[in-house]
Amino acid sequence: MKVYVIDYHKDDPKKCTGRKLVKLKLAELTRVGRGIILNPFSERTLSINDKDILIKSGITIIDTSWNNTSQNEFKNVRGEHRRLPILFAGNPIHYGIAYKLSSLEALMATLYILDEMKEAIKFSNVVKWGHTFIELNKELLEAYRNKDEEEIKKIEKEIIEKILRK
């Protein structure tokens, strides 16, 4: 399974998990999207139906800053764009905030949802807080794991409605 990173150099280099993956040779730096493109603005939600894409072509993470990102950074990247369902950041910068995942967290979530848990756990060892993300989202990740897009959207909708009722 290949992991690619498109780095827009908008993040603090010391906190950039995409660059860390490249530095550790766990990902390859690229300018071209390949396979699944993790895109928080995508209308399509990642699901088990995307596993063949992961196996054949890999996954591309677009590494940018949440503080100044826009759809334009994702729009021109070729590939199969997918967004992740609701999950909560376990990283120290955005801890507990829905959808604001680091590149590494997005990768771990993708692998977990696509039933590649051993790989997800392997990547969680890259940073001190990697296991925090998995533990914080364990119930959600298990609910999404191995599900098709419609099932995941239904689960996500129920979770959001539950949060809004509180």
Swiss-Prot record:
The species this protein belongs to is Saccharolobus islandicus (strain M.16.27)
Among NCBIfam families, the record links this protein to:
PRK02287.1
Output the Pfam families linked to this UniProt entry: Fer4_RLI, Ribo_biogen_C
Alphabetic keyword roster: Cytoplasm, Ribosome biogenesis, rRNA processing, S-adenosyl-L-methionine, Transferase
Q: Report residues binding S-adenosyl-L-methionine.
A: T17, I62, L84, Y99, S103
Cytoplasm in keyword set? yes
Q: Which GO terms describe its biological process?
A: enzyme-directed rRNA pseudouridine synthesis
KW Nuclease (keyword) present: no
**Under the cellular component aspect of Gene Ontology, which terms does the record hold?**
cytoplasm
Q: Name one GO molecular function term.
A: 18S rRNA aminocarboxypropyltransferase activity
Which InterPro entries does this one have? Answer: RNaseL-inhib-like_metal-bd_dom, Tsr3-like, Tsr3_C
- Describe the reaction catalysed, as an equation: an N(1)-methylpseudouridine in rRNA + S-adenosyl-L-methionine = N(1)-methyl-N(3)-[(3S)-3-amino-3-carboxypropyl]pseudouridine in rRNA + S-methyl-5'-thioadenosine + H(+)
Where is it mainly found?
A: cytoplasm
Supply the name of the protein: 16S rRNA aminocarboxypropyltransferase
Q: Lineage, please?
A: Archaea, Thermoproteota, Thermoprotei, Sulfolobales, Sulfolobaceae
Q: What is its EC number?
A: 2.5.1.157
Q: Where in the cell is it found?
A: Cytoplasm
Q: What class of enzyme is it?
A: transferase
Q: Which family does it belong to?
A: Belongs to the TDD superfamily. TSR3 family.
Q: What does this protein do?
A: Aminocarboxypropyltransferase that catalyzes the aminocarboxypropyl transfer on pseudouridine corresponding to position 914 in M.jannaschii 16S rRNA. It constitutes the last step in biosynthesis of the hypermodified N1-methyl-N3-(3-amino-3-carboxypropyl) pseudouridine (m1acp3-Psi).
